[in-house]
């Protein structure tokens, strides 16, 4: 913007209290110019800047006398470049939102927003007038250790986690001062798993030691989860475990609480499962199940085993007088007969002739079921499979076809076919061909 005669007054660039510009002269090197004294008192300038709306109309003072009292505490030291201030900032001068920051050390950060970013005016050199965008102009009110005139820490967004690379503390002194003002986020853990986050804060302070503390009004929020270091896995003393930390602690085998129990029915002292009867007394598993199923105590005396039918003492066939048989039967009169005589009478309704009597018991192989036959044939076929010396696809397919009538899957003979060769014929090449050659090959 060219300076014309219509703009009569030149004032200093900014006052420390008005624009929060408490920057030392080193922030703007090479800006030593001759300045004119301000033609308004300091308090009047504050009223002019903060009591005028966007159209240049006066509005009631929002901050009252406290702002003036605060402003008067700072001496009017003049430094910076010259700016042309129009009379009372009339509405004819539009807001310039496209200005760029001329000094590269002011970092634009989403955490450095100021509620008065529209009125901050900054120049790197006398000449063009530019108004900073909110993200750039807010860095003028950077976090100094001295108290600020207007310090309204912005509310951090709830969905976005803070970026440690954009906002890091400058030095140990400013970090300690700003830690008292910023919000503290803590990871809520059980009492036995409390983690110390002081080491992470110290590492973040050391990390940001090279950057200037004058560009960040709010320090880094503590990380929501500590860094992957020894703090994430606390020592074993916090967990009360073995020296390996999370290792399982071998505990001595607890003494069985079932020692001293005894079954009130049979007197057993060991059982897979202790049960109780209706009165609450302990029963072993066998006695308890018997009592549950039959409603009475399990008999202690085992019944005598019945002698096998073949060796039943004193029993003889009423027809052939034999004493050995696989099964004793009875005839129509109720007399015991051997298995052979009883079946013969059942089939022919006459007694078996004595001429058919044999000393030995004739036995025969029972007819195997179809399922047993299939299982046996599959087993024999699998035993013969490793004996085949040549393992070629043709022999394998023939062998599997021989098993097709045994396997429940009728299509097993088609499961293994002659495999395709791994290497293509020499006549085929997979290199890049010209389209004409491909047409020739297809034809």
From Swiss-Prot:
Keywords: Activator, DNA-binding, Immunity, Innate immunity, Metal-binding, Nucleus, Phosphoprotein, Repeat, Transcription, Transcription regulation, Zinc, Zinc-finger
Flexible linker, as annotated region: 288-316
Tissue-level expression: T-cell specific.
Residues with PTM Phosphoserine: 114, 161
Signal peptide: none
Chief place of localization: nucleus
YxKxHxxxRP (motif): residue ranges: 344-353
Induction context: Up-regulated during macrophage differentiation in response to IL33.
UniProt GO molecular function: cis-regulatory region sequence-specific DNA binding; DNA-binding transcription activator activity, RNA polymerase II-specific; DNA-binding transcription factor activity; DNA-binding transcription factor activity, RNA polymerase II-specific; DNA-binding transcription repressor activity, RNA polymerase II-specific; E-box binding; histone methyltransferase binding; HMG box domain binding
Alphabetized Pfam families for the sequence: GATA
Compartments where found: Nucleus
Domain of life from the UniProt record: Eukaryota
Region (Interaction with TBX21): 1-257
InterPro entries listed in its UniProt record: TF_GATA-2/3, Transcription_factor_GATA, Znf_GATA, Znf_NHR/GATA
GO cellular component: chromatin; nucleoplasm; nucleus
Zinc finger (GATA-type): 263-287, 317-341
Stretches the record annotates as Disordered: 1-28, 143-180, 193-214, 412-443
Biased composition (Polar residues): 200-214
GO BP term, pick one: positive regulation of transcription regulatory region DNA binding
Family annotation (PANTHER family): TRANS-ACTING T-CELL-SPECIFIC TRANSCRIPTION FACTOR GATA-3, TRANSCRIPTION FACTOR GATA FAMILY MEMBER
Annotated domain remarks: Binds DNA via the 2 GATA-type zinc fingers. Each zinc finger may bind either adjacent sites in a palindromic motif, or a different DNA molecule allowing looping and long-range gene regulation. The YxKxHxxxRP motif is critical for DNA-binding and function.
Quaternary structure and partners: Interacts with TBX21 ('Tyr-525' phosphorylated form).
Function: Transcriptional activator which binds to the enhancer of the T-cell receptor alpha and delta genes. Binds to the consensus sequence 5'-AGATAG-3'. Required for the T-helper 2 (Th2) differentiation process following immune and inflammatory responses. Positively regulates ASB2 expression. Coordinates macrophage transcriptional activation and UCP2-dependent metabolic reprogramming in response to IL33. Upon tissue injury, acts downstream of IL33 signaling to drive differentiation of inflammation-resolving alternatively activated macrophages.
Name by which UniProt lists this protein: Trans-acting T-cell-specific transcription factor GATA-3
Originating species: Mus musculus
Name of encoding gene: Gata3
């Amino acid at each position: 913007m060219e300076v014309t005669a219509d703009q009569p007054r030149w004032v200093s660039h900014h006052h420390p209290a008005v624009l929060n510009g408490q920057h030392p002269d080193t922030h703007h090197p090479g800006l030593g110019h001759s300045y004119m004294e301000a033609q308004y008192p300091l308090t009047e300038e504050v009223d002019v800047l903060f009591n005028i709306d966007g159209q240049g109309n006066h509005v009631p003072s929002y901050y009252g006398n406290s702002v003036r009292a605060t402003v008067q505490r700072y001496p009017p030291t003049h430094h910076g470049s010259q700016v042309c201030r129009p009379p009372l900032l009339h509405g004819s001068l539009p807001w310039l939102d496209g200005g760029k920051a001329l000094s590269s050390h002011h970092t634009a950060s989403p955490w450095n927003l100021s509620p008065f970013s529209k009125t901050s005016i900054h120049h790197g050199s006398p000449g063009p007038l530019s108004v900073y965008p909110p993200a750039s102009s807010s860095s003028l009110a950077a976090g100094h250790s001295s108290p600020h005139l207007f310090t309204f820490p912005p509310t951090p967004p709830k969905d976005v986690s803070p970026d440690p690379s954009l906002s890091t503390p400058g030095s140990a002194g400013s970090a300690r001062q700003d830690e008292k003002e910023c919000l503290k986020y803590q990871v809520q853990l059980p009492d036995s798993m409390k983690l110390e986050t002081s080491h992470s804060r110290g590492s973040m302070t050391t990390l940001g030691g090279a950057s200037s503390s004058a560009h960040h009004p709010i320090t880094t929020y503590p990380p929501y989860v500590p860094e992957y270091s020894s703090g994430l896995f606390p020592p074993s003393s916090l967990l009360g475990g073995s020296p390996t930390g999370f290792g399982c602690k071998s505990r001595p085998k607890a003494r069985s609480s079932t020692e001293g129990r005894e079954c009130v029915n049979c007197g057993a002292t060991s059982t897979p499962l202790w049960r109780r009867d209706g009165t609450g007394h302990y029963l072993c598993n066998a006695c308890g199940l018997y009592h549950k199923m039959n409603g009475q105590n399990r008999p202690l005396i085992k019944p005598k085993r019945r002698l096998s039918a073949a060796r039943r003492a004193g029993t003889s066939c009423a027809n052939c007088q034999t004493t050995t048989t696989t099964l004793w039967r009875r005839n129509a009169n109720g007399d015991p007969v051997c298995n052979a005589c009883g079946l013969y009478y059942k089939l022919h309704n006459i007694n078996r002739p004595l001429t058919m009597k044999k000393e030995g018991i004739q036995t025969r192989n029972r007819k195997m079921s179809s399922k047993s036959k299939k299982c046996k044939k599959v087993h024999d076929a699998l035993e013969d499979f490793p004996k085949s010396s040549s393992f070629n696809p043709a022999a394998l397919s023939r062998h599997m076809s021989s098993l097709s009538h045994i396997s429940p899957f009728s299509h097993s003979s088609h499961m293994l076919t002659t495999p395709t060769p791994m290497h293509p014929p020499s006549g085929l090449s997979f290199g890049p061909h010209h389209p004409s050659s491909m047409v020739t090959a297809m034809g």
